[in-house]
């Protein structure tokens, strides 16, 4: 579809064979729909790319590998986190979505190892994590509850999503209790971390901050007229 140089080296022979079979059997309208979906909502795009525009954007990153991208991010943290500490801001990096190379671009926030490297690079509370259970859950080897537990004290924001994965690596958004991630375990870990912070006297949010996990659960319970369960 994109005729991107080197794309065939990034996929297994089985996926390439399936893609070729689909392309040969598909209509022009089906191909146009697929291309529109590929171009919709790409990261870093304020407007929808066309094929030449996407290729031009990708060309800017030619020769930049995972180590280069990670080193650049570490330089960013070294420059920004001290100021964040001074003014009381909690930075929180969002995991890559999907958590694997995309369009030939490397990923540096895809799993527990990546997260540990980032948080250790600036061992400050201001250098934290957005726990997106959907992004991390799309990785076949990611144990999202384990990641939540390991980095609980550095999680400053959470995107509570769930996804269902297929054997070929495809994934789709799922109901909160209908995907592959144990969302009850994830929420339990977050509530326990929130309780610890309250007991330590830590300020969880300012007046303008988004609601906490407990706030959201309480709202759901009020809507359903069910008493909210205490955090434990």
Show the residue positions of the predicted features:
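Histidine-acidic metal/acid-base catalytic patches
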Residues: 14-16, 27, 50-65, 74-90, ...
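Residue-level "edge-of-site" marker
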Residues: 97
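Extended, charge-rich helix/loop segments that form flexible
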Residues: 1-70
């Amino acid at each position: 579809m994109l005729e991107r140089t080197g794309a065939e080296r990034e996929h297994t022979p089985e996926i390439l064979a399936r893609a070729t079979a689909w392309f040969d059997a598909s209509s022009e309208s089906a191909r146009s729909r697929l291309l529109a979906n590929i171009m919709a909502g790409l990261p870093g795009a304020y407007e929808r790319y066309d094929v030449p525009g996407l290729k031009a954007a990708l060309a800017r990153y030619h020769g930049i590998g995972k180590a280069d991208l990670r080193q650049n991010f570490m330089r960013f943290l070294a420059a920004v986190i001290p100021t964040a500490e001074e003014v009381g801001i909690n930075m929180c990096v969002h995991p890559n979505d999907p958590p694997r190379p995309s369009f030939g671009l490397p990923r540096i926030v895809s799993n527990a190892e990546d997260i540990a490297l980032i948080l250790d690079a600036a061992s400050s509370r201001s250098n934290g994590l957005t726990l997106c259970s959907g992004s991390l859950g799309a990785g076949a080897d990611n144990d999202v509850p384990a990641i939540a537990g390991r980095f609980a004290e550095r999680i400053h924001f959470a995107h509570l999503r769930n996804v269902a994965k297929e054997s070929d690596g495809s994934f789709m958004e799922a109901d909160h209790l209908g995907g592959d991630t144990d969302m009850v375990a994830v929420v339990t870990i977050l509530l326990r971390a929130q309780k610890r912070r309250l007991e330590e006297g830590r300020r969880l949010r300012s007046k303008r901050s988004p609601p906490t996990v407990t706030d959201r659960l309480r709202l759901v319970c009020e809507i359903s007229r069910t008493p909210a369960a205490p955090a434990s």
